[in-house]
From Swiss-Prot:
It comes from Penicillium rubens (strain ATCC 28089 / DSM 1075 / NRRL 1951 / Wisconsin 54-1255). Residues 237-251, 262-295, 436-453 have a biased composition (Low complexity). Residues 63-72, 104-114, 155-165, 252-261, 367-401 have a biased composition (Polar residues). The lineage of its organism: Eukaryota, Fungi, Dikarya, Ascomycota, Pezizomycotina. BrlA, abaA and wetA are pivotal regulators of conidiophore development and conidium maturation. They act individually and together to regulate their own expression and that of numerous other sporulation-specific genes. Responsible for activating a set of genes whose products make up the final two conidial wall layers or direct their assembly and though this activity is responsible for acquisition of spore dormancy. This is Developmental regulatory protein wetA. GO terms for biological process: conidium formation; sporulation resulting in formation of a cellular spore.
Amino acid sequence: MFAQPYDHSFNDLFNQYVNMETSAVDGKDSALSDFDQLFPLDSLSSDCGDLPPTVSTPKRHQSPQPWSNEWSLQDDGAAADHFAFHDTVHPSAISDVNLNNFEVPSRPTASHGLSTSPSTPPATPRRKPTQSALITPKSIRHRSPNERRSHLRKQSFSPSLMRSSNLSKARMAYPEAWAQRLQNFSLHGSEDRLPLSPPPSDVLIQHENMPTEQIMNQHGDSAERPSQYDARLYQQSPSVSMPSPSIAMSARQQQHYIAQPSSSSLTNSSPSSADDIFSSSHSSDPHSLSSWQSDPLHASSLSFTPDLQGQDSQWWSPMPSRVAQQQAAYLTSPTPVRTMQSVGSQNDMMQGGLMIQFNPSYDMSADHSFSSSNMLPATPQKFDTSFNTSQVHNVSRSPSLSPKAGTSPRDTRNGSISKPTHRRTHSRKLSGQSMNAPKPAKASGSSSRGSNKSVSVSFVNFTAHDSKKILTGVAPSGSSKTKARREQEARDRRRKLSEAALRAVRSAGGDVEALEAVLC
């Protein structure tokens, strides 16, 4: 049962809706025409009253408006047998199919369960008394669009904005139900008056209360319908003149849903929970009406504007987790992959689709924030230049880890190059000690003046510590005689150099004793 505050608020909103419909003589209110083609006013008006809905049939023909004639069923038997809309979507055909195929025990249950709202406004068209006595879920289904419309007008949104978010909610809620019922919409000649994005709750609740044999009968033509439905249902009709936020959001939703294949959009991967709309939604029993009437519709239909914003936040909320999962892969990926993808991923993030190119741009700006509006183009340019230069200098190495590590790519590049530099200089020192051995002999000469003469002692290796000791094992020849002779020659040369240095110091008037103390 519905709660009393919900009934009163809905009665006011419903009266507002009825007054708007009767005041528009042409019947083509742009904000309401797409609702009216999928939601019949006959089942709505007969189900939303506080009194039991016992309304006579001729009221259906009293209103001279053209929309009532447009809604009238062309051929009840044909529509009930084939379940195909003719030129426009006739909601009375849908209700007639439900009327002919409903089982009898579902009628008193639903009629007693929904007879608590205030009195019915008199200006809406009516169906037969059997149709009036029958309570389909369309009354409940029509309450949510009315609530949506009023709340969205208060919040300056448009109805198609709300319906498109509800479409994204409930489209993936029932994969089997949505697949089977979506295939039964043969919308062949209806581009002129087709709504932008019909609420899928019309399909879902009907399928919930359809008998299984009719579902199995309609399951035959399931091959050619969904692509046609996706291609044509979301085209903007020329007769619907929507306000600009509605057009923008519907275009965005159109790109979003056409980009998704029907198979992937029918999976259970919807970020919105189906329990916001239907709490016990997984049975096709008509008696399950009483279990989801009371609270979930009250919760979901009275808070539509926060529900829309929550829907958007839920839709984008898995993105940081996906970025966190794929960020490690991108941190260790080769350089050209990251740079090219970061340049290519600067597209508009609200394009929707399958979100193929989101993660590289998220990875580039993940150090700053995960918000989708922080796509700074300077960040990938900085990374491009640094990574390219590092690849020129150091081709065999993969790029540095990430800017998150605290060091820029140039720092890590210099560090990686400096390590081979140290190795090269060390090896040069080692080879210099073996190949360029005579060079230290200059510094270890007898004096600074005599060091230019010490080049002749090229076969002796002097170190920094044994300047007074001649090394014996360095001679290239292996003979002991040659070794002893060269050592003797070295001693003689050193003695001669020392004497020459002493003579030079004496001739210059220097301190000979100090020099002898150093040399000897």
